[in-house]
Amino acid sequence: MEDFVRQCFNPMIVELAEKAMKEYGEDPKIETNKFAAICTHLEVCFMYSDFHFIDERGESIIVESGDPNALLKHRFEIIEGRDRTMAWTVVNSICNTTGVEKPKFLPDLYDYKENRFIEIGVTRREVHIYYLEKANKVKSEKTHIHIFSFTGEEMATKADYTLDEESRARIKTRLFTIRQEMASRGLWDSFVSPREAKRQLKKDLKSQEQCAGLPTKVSHRTSPALKTLEPMWMDSNRTAALRASFLKCPKK
């Protein structure tokens, strides 16, 4: 699974996922299913934001290419992927500026058009079950919830899906592609089933013990695209960098 994650996702996303797991004392090399889930969630958050802007009249528009000097503001602020201190700094700044109620838990995005925080969910289970779990955790009608599944289903607060149909279809297609690529490598069942994942983990740990004495080569590359997660007022090229996040999984 770890090899699949590193091949399938943009290096920026992989680095952010590794950083997030290490912040909580988790090892991406051991908890590989969680590693894959975090990368998937990060990519969906970026895709949710990509190409969506607010023009000088305050209208929401979609721009895939055009004048980089146009008076456009990113519609969504990406909170997911930042370290907790910076994430709360951004949330507090948004609340102080807009007057929106501060959430109890860190959300994933902020929508400047609808003036609301958004919690994004990506589930391997039934969307309505995961939606209820999210709603029970958030416990706030002010935070909008939007759930996607790997089967193309989705569910959102008050059936308000925020994005246009084409943007949502792009996310669903990407999730379906990830599922197909996992299945073709024999990884999907363990990704979905905790019991199978536990069995696979024991197998991986045993394999690591056998290979402990072998030399390894490690890359310490740092992606310049990490700058795209600076606060919006510090960022000038976010859209171009985020487009690189939506790479297709390579063919086997």
Curated annotation (Swiss-Prot):
Disulfide bonds: none annotated. The active site is at E80, D108. Gene3D superfamilies: Influenza RNA-dependent RNA polymerase subunit PA, endonuclease domain. The record marks K202, K203, K206 as: Important for efficient shutoff activity. InterPro entries: PA/PA-X (IPR001009), PA/PA-X_sf (IPR038372). Keywords: Decay of host mRNAs by virus, Eukaryotic host gene expression shutoff by virus, Host cytoplasm, Host gene expression shutoff by virus, Host mRNA suppression by virus, Host nucleus, Host-virus interaction. GO terms for molecular function: RNA binding. It is found in: Host cytoplasm; Host nucleus. The record marks R195, K198, R199 as: Important for efficient shutoff activity and nuclear localization. GO terms for biological process: viral RNA genome replication; viral translational frameshifting. Plays a major role in the shutoff of the host protein expression by cleaving mRNAs probably via an endonuclease activity. This host shutoff allows the virus to escape from the host antiviral response. Hijacks host RNA splicing machinery to selectively target host RNAs containing introns for destruction. This may explain the preferential degradation of RNAs that have undergone co- or post-transcriptional processing. Belongs to the influenza viruses PA-X family. The probable endonuclease active site in the N-terminus and the basic amino acid cluster in the C-terminus are important for the shutoff activity. The C-terminus acts as a nuclear localization signal. The C-terminus is recruited to host protein complexes involved in nuclear Pol II RNA processing. This is Protein PA-X.
